[in-house]
A protein has these predicted regions:
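A generic local structural motif
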Residues: 46, 87-89, 116-118
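Conserved catalytic network of the ASCE P-loop NTPase/AAA+ motor domain
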Residues: 50-52, 92-95, 123
Length: 158
């Protein structure tokens, strides 16, 4: 098990035994996270680096607008960005990292839930994956059964 006892944000966000967690925000329409969500991602990267300065962290999203915004936020506000990758899903196939933060903007929900891309995004981390999305993701009607079951499993564990 992972010992997050000294790291309140990690303890409240990830499971002690690793795996996938879900964090819901009220997100604006479009591709950019809310101020609250953006601040959370930066704080999470900072705390992961305090937990393990050498941790490899991937922050993933679908489109370049989101990535550019997150890169600017993370690289200007995080104290340690060594081994922090902020990139699109399509550019990271084959990548493995310790922690993965997968941001799904409201506009990208249909795209994010396509099974092949969802699988790529949720299978990058050796330790923990965090999905960050709007509350509407849980009620998306065209979600595949496999992805729907994945969300149900995450919600039961969390």
């Amino acid at each position: 098990p992972l010992n997050f006892s000294q790291f309140q944000l990690l303890k409240n966000t990830f499971q002690n035994n690793g795996g996938t967690s879900l964090k819901i925000f009220e997100l604006p329409d479009g591709r950019i996270p809310s101020g609250e969500c953006s601040k959370f991602i930066v704080e999470l990267v900072n705390e992961l680096k305090q937990y393990n300065a050498k941790a490899e962290i991937a922050v993933l999203a679908f489109n370049r607008d989101t990535i550019r915004f997150l890169q600017k936020e993370i690289f200007s506000k995080s104290s340690n960005t060594e081994d922090v990758l902020v990139e699109t899903i399509d550019r990271i196939q084959g990548l493995t990292t310790a922690f993965c933060i997968f941001f799904i903007p409201t506009e990208s929900i249909p795209f994010a839930l396509q099974i092949n891309r969802f699988n790529v995004a949720t299978s990058r981390a050796r330790l923990c994956t965090l999905l960050i999305a709007d509350k509407d993701i849980l009620h998306f009607t065209t979600i595949s059964e496999e992805v729907s079951n994945y969300f149900k499993k995450i919600l039961q564990i969390g």
